[in-house]
Regions:
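Glycine-rich phosphate/nucleotide-binding loop
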Residues: 51-152
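Glycine-rich phosphate/diphosphate-binding loop of Rossmann-like nucleotide-binding domains
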Residues: 1-44
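Short acidic loop-to-helix transition motifs that present clustered carboxylates
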Residues: 43-51
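Conserved small/polar residues in nucleotide/adenosyl-binding loops
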Residues: 161-168
Length: 168
């Protein structure tokens, strides 16, 4: 595949949600027959959240695929590995178009309080620019964002790194 993904992890609970996840799983299997070079593995949602905490690198260069409810759970769980949900961006791809957005909601309770992390919005734009064929611009945005975060000077409270005290 062009994107470099090695495996799709489909997340269900079809042992309990037989009808809805049964429909989802049938669609996954049908699609997998068209893309035989990409591996497919099924995880139940409860086990997937545990694996994301214990062994997140297992899912590098892979696609996590599920229904909206389970992906809401997964995105919250996984966001802890990268700082907060404020850093998670997403892309929804169709046959001819794509849409990019932060994974978090609008958080109106934080309006005007200078607390909201802009990283997901910035990186959503970087991913969109890459989709539009401007990979060099996308790389520059990702690099600049990474540099600012690593500098640890201009970050929101959810990313602020403080050294552990000698007692820790």
């Amino acid at each position: 595949n062009d994107a470099g993904f090695r495996k799709v992890f489909a997340i269900t609970k079809r042992n309990i949600l037989k009808e809805t996840d049964g429909i989802f799983w049938a669609a996954v299997e049908k699609t997998q027959r068209e893309f035989k070079t990409i591996g497919l593995e099924e995880y139940y949602i409860d086990n997937m959240t545990q694996q994301l905490v214990k062994n997140p690198e297992r899912f590098n260069n892979s696609v996590l695929l599920s229904t909206n409810l389970f992906m809401d759970i997964i995105s919250e769980c996984a966001s802890g590995h990268v700082g907060s949900i404020g850093t998670v961006y997403s892309g929804n791809y169709g046959d001819h178009y794509a849409m990019f957005e932060p994974a978090h909601g609008s958080a109106p309770k934080y309006a005007g309080k200078n607390k909201v992390n802009p990283v997901a919005t910035i990186l959503s734009g970087a991913w969109m620019v890459e989709y539009l064929g401007e990979k060099h611009i996308s790389k520059a945005i990702f690099k600049a964002t990474e540099d600012v975060i690593n500098e640890n000077k201009y970050v929101t409270y959810c990313l602020l790194y403080t050294s552990p005290s000698p007692r820790d």
